[in-house]
């Protein structure tokens, strides 16, 4: 059957329309998205006086995190176990007055990135040049996070990598590079997800706390047993050790955990240190997964765990992170702890521990005002 010119033209237009439809849809969708972005920016500007814009690609920060690939025996729970390790820390490592960015990777053979601030709104990855890129080698574990502290008081921030594996300490060579000094007294293996620098004894030198998650005898790439998970969802106490290292002042550290009263094996995910009682001695707070948080009070001689007596350590939660701040303008720190939540399963909510009225110093007590404060 012959088609006339009009039919052929209509058929051609139909096929052209089919070809153009996805493009038109994308353009319309893009315009709608742009309109929504502009609306959100305007509303944010009206409500808060500023708005945030995603500029990582323009700024040269193109990092893609690679998660850990662990022993195949964990295949059934791999998404849960391998969900950790993406971290970012901000530091002016070269003391040029501009903040730089360090991000960690968590796959064997993957590289971390150190983005140096170029002073023009862009960043350049100098991790290879500085010696802190190739840190996730077979047999050494993978990065879970990074914290910075000037442990030798030379004015430059040094780098501690916490890992599921061997913790790595890098000395900052005055902003020109980093030297690995891991043999400074740190253990060969800690499955850690948190650490904090703080001068617990007031000698002017930064000491170090590292919180274990999985037990230190567990190698997640070569398991001798799959019985590695918490023994309770509320009061688990079969996790990794908590380590306190005293800075000896000669570039080395001594492990003093038990001597200083820190022996817990709860599953540490976050830690922070501050003088919560106003005694001049920094205390230590640990947010634990699968259980209660811990508050270690520093009396100047050793630590004692005071979570229950201060009102904090009685409610089991899945602590994810912790931060201090005087949000009530009391002249005393409140403690904010984030918790994991899953609708219908884990509706825990975050905690805001505020000092109770009439309590202070060594008699301080806390109450949870998270719900009241919204």
Model-assigned labels for residue ranges:
Residues 1-374:
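Acidic, glycine/proline-rich Ca2+-coordinating loop motifs
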